Amino acid sequence: MRRAPERLSACHAMARKPQTPPDRETERFHEERAATTLRGADRPDIELGAGVIRETVQTLKPKPGVYRMLDARGDVLYVGKARALKNRVANYTQVERLPNRLRRMVSQTRSMTIVTTNSEAEALLLEAQLIKRFRPPYNVLLRDDKSFPFILLRGDHAFPRISKHRGARKAKGNYYGPFASAGSVNTTINALQKLFLLRSCNDGFMARRDRPCLLYQIRRCSAPCVGRISEADYGELVRQAKDFLGGKSGAVQREIEAQMHKAAEDLDFERAAMLRDRLRAATFIQGSQAINAEGVGNADVFAMATKGGQVAVQAFFIRGGQNWGHRAFFPSHTEGLSEEEVMTSFLAQFYEEVPPARLILVDRALPEADLLAEALCEAAGGKVEISVPQRGDRRRLMEQAQRNAVEALDRRMAESGTKAKVMRELAEFLELPEVPQRIEIYDNSHIQGTNALGAMVVAGPEGFVKGQYRKWNIKLAQTNDDFAMMREVMTRRFGRAQEEDPDRESGNWPDLVLIDGGKGQMSAVKEALGELGIEDVPLVAIAKGPHHGREGREVFHFPDGREKMLPVNSPVLFQLQVMRDEVHRFAIGAHRAKRSRAITASPLDEIPGIGPARKRALLLHFGTAGKVRAASLEDLQRAPGVSAAVAQTIYDFYHPSG
């Protein structure tokens, strides 16, 4: 293990984090003016690719920026950043010095896109954004892109609510995290409710209460909804909770313990018992921290393990000396890169979604640590230190992270071997020519034909690919026909695939289509694909067998009418059931969301220019959508948040004739 002295990375100049909308890059970089696009043939040709790059180099200057290699279809092969674009891109023209991985990339390159930036730190941030967006095959990829949960203590109510939060941090309040998983957040919130008796209900539920709910009865809430606690006393509980989550857990415990002894001396045994239970909850939270990090404070800890060409990165999240969970990541496309390059790319992508700690501990010296720290300054709100711990609590914590990384990689490799064996057996059972790399599973969901939709989930060798999930709102007038729904979904899915990728080069054509259903669904799918002239996509329908409830058996229907079954203890059966259950879960969830939107729909939604915030303001002011419709132009103009132009738009919508 190579070690380096601890190093403080200062923010020499705050890096401005570029914001990239989902549909295109920000115009601030003037990509259209900076882009250089040179087209060539679509067959792999290293001389042709190198020629494209040489012509691009002639247009470049030694300025910082980001470059993209594109193939003949315009798909992104690679995203890179550079302090001096001209020098960096020129390196790719020396093909004899490139590793095999980059030689393959150059042979496929048919155009380049260049974006200049104000600094190398800004280029690093944009590079991470573009890698996350395009997922190029020659970049290191952070495959686990699920957002991290936080604990939110709201700051916009007299009696703040504690809750789990994911996504953009728009709500006013204090955020604590990240936590490694939803489970760790839920466990912590449950313990915090026992400790501080804070409410977890939403504001509407609280406003409607006329008596305490069950949480008050089991001593997990102080019932501010019905006045069982004053605003001042509740504020004291909130203050203690903030101190506890902010790293002052010892002081909070001592404070509660002193209050408990005082209550006992005053013979207030009921209050003493309540404080005793709160103290136990505090002890439970600290005892549940599998890692002792009292001497670390706030830090993110990363350690890497490599074996057999695979990589694992173990992350620990330490806040206030408490371990808020850990998670293992398995970056892909790491062939031919140094461990330091993999770690740097991983961290840049990781902090695209997660606010960085002011202290980032890594298990190896990173050549671009200063650059990365500078780029993360703005998101962290100040200096970011990236260092390799040498001694003390930090070193012990890093050693534990390293052990966890090795164990995680060993488990991953063992699971991959088992999974590969199951996939080979699955291919054999379903009579496929080779192990499928992309399996699409389909299901429909509706209630007596209402809010009908079709759903597709995608599975691959590494599991489910959630970014590829799709759903379709059924357009048929008569949607109580499951078979017709399945025909529509297949027609729309594969009709579009034929238009966009007729040569099947994008990797988005399935090696197997698995249908949740029986003979009827199979016939509908065959008919739909036959009308499109598609006869070479393997099809299988999975239906509950006659003894499903007792034995868990399933019947598999093939296009030629044959039926097959698997032993009840077969790993292949279990794998196929998991796939079927996943599409069922996704379809049901999407249907519920669609039904919920339909139930809560308002006539105001149809008015152009009226968003959720303005709709709420109108309903609060007038009471109902009907009263908004009946309001005069003058009444609309007096409503809060409604300008004269918006008032005129609303009035004209309901009174088209004037």
From Swiss-Prot:
Spell out the GO cellular component terms annotated for this protein, sorted alphabetically and separated by semicolons: cytoplasm; excinuclease repair complex
Q: Where in the cell is it found?
A: Cytoplasm
Q: Which SUPFAM superfamilies match?
A: C-terminal UvrC-binding domain of UvrB, GIY-YIG endonuclease, RuvA domain 2-like
Swiss-Prot/TrEMBL keywords: Cytoplasm, DNA damage, DNA excision, DNA repair, Excision nuclease, SOS response
Q: Which ranges carry the GIY-YIG domain?
A: 62-140
Predominant location category: cytoplasm
GO process annotations (BP): nucleotide-excision repair; SOS response
GO MF term list = DNA binding; excinuclease ABC activity
Q: What Gene3D superfamilies does the record tag this protein with?
A: 5' to 3' exonuclease, C-terminal subdomain (1.10.150.20), GIY-YIG endonuclease (3.40.1440.10), UVR domain (4.10.860.10), UvrC, RNAse H endonuclease domain (3.30.420.340)
From the UniProt annotation, give the residues forming the signal peptide.
none
Q: Does the keyword Metal-binding apply?
A: no
Q: Which family does it belong to?
A: Belongs to the UvrC family.
The record describes the protein's role as:
The UvrABC repair system catalyzes the recognition and processing of DNA lesions. UvrC both incises the 5' and 3' sides of the lesion. The N-terminal half is responsible for the 3' incision and the C-terminal half is responsible for the 5' incision.
- For this entry, the protein name equals UvrABC system protein C
Q: Which organism is it from?
A: Novosphingobium aromaticivorans (strain ATCC 700278 / DSM 12444 / CCUG 56034 / CIP 105152 / NBRC 16084 / F199)
